[in-house]
């Protein structure tokens, strides 16, 4: 069987090349925005998609902000653990990684509760409907500059919904495999003798109890857990890069609003209409909204 180190090298090579291709493609896409005039209409004319529904509540914004900060911490600490560029920092980075992991897991649990069980449950906003599937080709044609506008049926189009839906199982997989790699004892278990040592670790529970038995070897289970965790880490880097790019270039006001910076968007819109000689700011109606 191929060794873990050798496999990690191949994963690094494949995803580094893939990431480079994606960055070049996004640069080309932005050039297309400039050549077609979309960038000027948006960032100069401040014409952006109009969203159906009310403003985004404070709770999802807070959870989104916490998630972003924790995911950045996970990415940086995870890459350092894989590529330690200075000596002596691995222990600190592991703790940063574990703390950020706990925040992401807790945040995901609360967000799922909010989506399905809270008074303001919003899971329907992310559900892919029959109309979404029908309009999906038009959305894709818009993104590749074949169509000048895209259908926008609600707060999110079908591609956005698909991305958010994919994030949930990926986060769950990353949480399980991350806990399987956890070798520090769970708090308050230091007095328990488990698998021949003091304290219960995530690796003991996930790899030692069931994954190892399922695969016939705890070493093999740990090997799979580490490999899957690393691949999903790269998938998050790729998907998040695309997500951030499209958030900024396709709906910058919503991007600002999610981080509590909507006052910048309002200032830009007011300045734009003052330049046009309007005394009032009408509701935004984008030329990209079909």
Each predicted region: which residue ranges?
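Membrane-embedded alpha-helical bundles that constitute the cytochrome b-like, heme-associated redox core
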Residues: 1-290
């Amino acid at each position: 069987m191929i060794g873990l180190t050798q496999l990690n090298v191949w994963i690094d090579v494949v995803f580094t090349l893939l990431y480079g291709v994606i960055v070049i493609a996004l640069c080309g896409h932005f050039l297309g925005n400039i050549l077609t005039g979309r960038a000027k209409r948006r960032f100069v004319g401040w014409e952006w998609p109009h969203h159906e529904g009310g403003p985004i509540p404070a709770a999802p914004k807070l959870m989104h902000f916490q998630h972003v900060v924790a995911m950045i911490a996970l990415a940086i600490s995870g890459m350092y653990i894989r590529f330690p560029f200075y000596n002596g920092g691995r222990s600190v980075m592991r703790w940063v990684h574990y703390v950020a992991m706990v925040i992401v897991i807790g945040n995901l649990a609360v967000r799922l509760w909010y989506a399905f069980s809270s008074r303001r449950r919003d899971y329907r906003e992310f559900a892919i409907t029959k109309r979404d599937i029908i309009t999906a080709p038009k959305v894709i044609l818009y993104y590749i500059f074949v169509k000048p506008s895209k259908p926008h049926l609600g707060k999110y189009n079908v591609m956005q919904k698909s991305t958010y839906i994919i994030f949930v199982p990926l986060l769950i997989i990353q949480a399980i495999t991350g806990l399987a790699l956890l070798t520090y004892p769970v708090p308050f278990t230091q007095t328990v003798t488990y698998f021949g040592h003091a304290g219960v670790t995530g690796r003991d529970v996930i790899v030692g109890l069931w994954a190892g038995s399922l695969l016939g070897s705890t070493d093999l289970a740990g090997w799979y857990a580490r490999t899957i965790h690393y691949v999903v880490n790269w998938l998050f880097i790729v998907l998040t890069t695309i997500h951030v790019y499209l958030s900024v270039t396709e709906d910058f006001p919503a991007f600002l609003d999610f981080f509590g910076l909507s006052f910048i968007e309002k200032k830009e819109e007011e300045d734009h209409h003052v330049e046009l000689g309007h005394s009032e700011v009408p509701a935004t109606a984008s030329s990209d909204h079909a």
